[in-house]
């Protein structure tokens, strides 16, 4: 039953993978998602005029905090010593979309993809929370890993990585 699944034991029960024998390497991951708003809500967000305050600064802090707590939220994730975590936003007022991008890095035995994804998603959920008083039909979508480097599997670049954009320094 567990054949091919690293997080299942021989009986099919969940288990945490033993990474103790792996070599520590520098690992970096970039993840993204989108928050779709109405034009009216976007105008409030862009001018920091939402009733709850400045959504983007709050979301940035929430995303960074979430990256540091990923192992507490995702049951089989290893706690990692993060070297860096950041959250950035591309506010597209014309499309009424906030593109959230999160980056995390470490020197460890396992990757930081989940930390980057968690940071992006929690930042997006924080934007949702900050905007829900003025809009009920907000959509959070397109959560994905854009880039990862380090470790045995090497570098992954999503087809959605922007053309011409340099890869992060690993």
Swiss-Prot record:
The active site is at 129. It comes from the Bacteria. One of its GO terms (molecular function) is cyclic pyranopterin monophosphate synthase activity. Pathway: Cofactor biosynthesis; molybdopterin biosynthesis. Keywords: Lyase, Molybdenum cofactor biosynthesis. Pfam families: MoaC. SUPFAM superfamilies: Molybdenum cofactor biosynthesis protein C, MoaC. It catalyses: (8S)-3',8-cyclo-7,8-dihydroguanosine 5'-triphosphate = cyclic pyranopterin phosphate + diphosphate. Its EC number is 4.6.1.17. InterPro entries: MoaC, MoaC_bact/euk, MoaC_sf, MoCo_biosynth_MoaA/MoaC, Mopterin_CF_biosynth-C_dom. Substrate binds at residues 76-78, 114-115. Homohexamer; trimer of dimers. Belongs to the MoaC family. This is Cyclic pyranopterin monophosphate synthase. It comes from Solidesulfovibrio magneticus (strain ATCC 700980 / DSM 13731 / RS-1) (Desulfovibrio magneticus).
């Amino acid at each position: 039953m567990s054949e091919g699944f690293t997080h299942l034991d021989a009986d099919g029960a969940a288990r945490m993978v033993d990474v103790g024998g792996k070599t520590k390497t520098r690992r970096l991951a970039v993840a993204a998602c989108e928050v779709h708003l109405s034009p009216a809500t976007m105008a409030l967000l862009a001018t920091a005029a939402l009733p709850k305050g400045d959504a983007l600064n709050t979301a940035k802090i929430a995303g960074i905090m979430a990256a540091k707590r990923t192992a507490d939220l995702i049951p089989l994730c290893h706690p990692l010593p993060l070297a860096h975590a950041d959250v950035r936003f591309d506010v597209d007022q014309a499309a009424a979309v906030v593109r959230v991008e999160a980056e995390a890095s470490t020197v460890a035995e396992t990757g930081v993809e989940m930390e980057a994804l968690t940071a992006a998603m929690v930042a997006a959920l924080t934007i949702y929370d900050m905007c829900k008083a003025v809009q009920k039909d907000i959509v959070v979508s397109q959560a994905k890993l854009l880039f990862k480097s380090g470790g045995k599997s090497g570098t992954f670049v999503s087809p959605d990585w922007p053309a011409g954009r340099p890869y992060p320094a690993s």
